[in-house]
Amino acid sequence: MAILAFQKPENVLMMETSDSIAKFEFKPLEPGYGITIGNALRRILLSSLEGFAITAIKIEGVEHEFATIPGVLEDVTNIILNLKQVRFKQIVPNADVEKATIVISNSEVFRAGDLNAQLSNFEVLNSNLVICHLDKSATLTMEFSINKGRGYVSAEENRAEHNELSTIAIDSIYTPIRNVKYAVENFRVEQKTDYEKLLMEVTTDGSIRPVDALREAAQILISHFSLFAENKIAIEYVDIVDTDEFDEDSLHMRQLLKSKLSGLDLSVRALNCLNAAGVDTLGDLVSLSRSDLMKIRNFGKKSLTELDELLATLNLSFGMDISKYKLDKD
């Protein structure tokens, strides 16, 4: 029996494009395909594209991240929070890492753009980002490492590669995607009005064009779905054994779930609401459902949207069963 043809776009229409933001239109789509495709692409865009970030720093005269620096207004913890926001664009192909040292003196403000003079392989995109304020008499000497990665990597994981004395590993947010929005609208094909049109808006940090980001996300999905379509499904019988030992992926997830929310880029309002409700770690958060969160005092839809985007970046979701990671056994 012949397979009926699906209604699908002949091409993707790109509108209102720039180096960092673009809108895309897919039409027509079969009923239900708008949200299926839109949600899959959004999650991949937010969690799975490669980017560049600072992974570790070493500040002269500083032994740990809780120290203060003479003549510098911000403490080391706040400096680290600012450094996590610095966005980089690769300017030398295949140069995926770089280590450099910067000396700030005779200046009252240290901005992200000051790093450019010390870099050979990368360019800072958000040059006006303030890292810290200094007295004019103060001198700040800092070594920093830039690496290539995907998604979010905790300071604990980075510490394995940066374990030199006085080196401070920091959380790295590699994703080059700032935001992804999509909407599904009804679309008419001849006399049928129940087809769909998918509208997507992709905003990047400028290190990758939105059209290239969308193309990469689609290729990632295709590479995974092709396993089901190319006769690569094998039946394997595995004996399930209850054990406290974890494989590498489980250890990574276990470490991620134990991460403190205070170390992530959450708004003060959302963080205060969660802390007041006893939600302190990512494990605590993903154990809850959206309805559970909305019952928390002073917690609103804006905070829920913020958390949705955070979890998508980390490839997590609400209502997860985390019992297999045995977080209570340490």
UniProtKB/Swiss-Prot annotation:
InterPro entries: DNA-dir_RNA_pol_insert, DNA-dir_RNA_pol_RpoA/D/Rpb3, DNA-dir_RpoA, RBP11-like, RNAP_asu_C, RNApol_insert_sf. It holds the Pfam family RNA_pol_A_CTD. GO terms for cellular component: cytoplasm; DNA-directed RNA polymerase complex. Residues 1-232 are annotated as: Alpha N-terminal domain (alpha-NTD). Its EC number is 2.7.7.6. It catalyses: RNA(n) + a ribonucleoside 5'-triphosphate = RNA(n+1) + diphosphate. It is an enzyme of class 2 (transferase). The keyword Nucleotidyltransferase applies. Residues 248-330 are annotated as: Alpha C-terminal domain (alpha-CTD). GO terms for molecular function: DNA binding; DNA-directed RNA polymerase activity; protein dimerization activity. Keywords: DNA-directed RNA polymerase, Nucleotidyltransferase, Transcription, Transferase. GO terms for biological process: DNA-templated transcription. Gene3D superfamilies: 5' to 3' exonuclease, C-terminal subdomain (1.10.150.20), DNA-directed RNA polymerase, insert domain (2.170.120.12), RNA polymerase, RBP11-like subunit (3.30.1360.10). Homodimer. The RNAP catalytic core consists of 2 alpha, 1 beta, 1 beta' and 1 omega subunit. When a sigma factor is associated with the core the holoenzyme is formed, which can initiate transcription. The N-terminal domain is essential for RNAP assembly and basal transcription, whereas the C-terminal domain is involved in interaction with transcriptional regulators and with upstream promoter elements. Belongs to the RNA polymerase alpha chain family. DNA-dependent RNA polymerase catalyzes the transcription of DNA into RNA using the four ribonucleoside triphosphates as substrates. This is DNA-directed RNA polymerase subunit alpha. It comes from Porphyromonas gingivalis (strain ATCC BAA-308 / W83). The gene is rpoA.
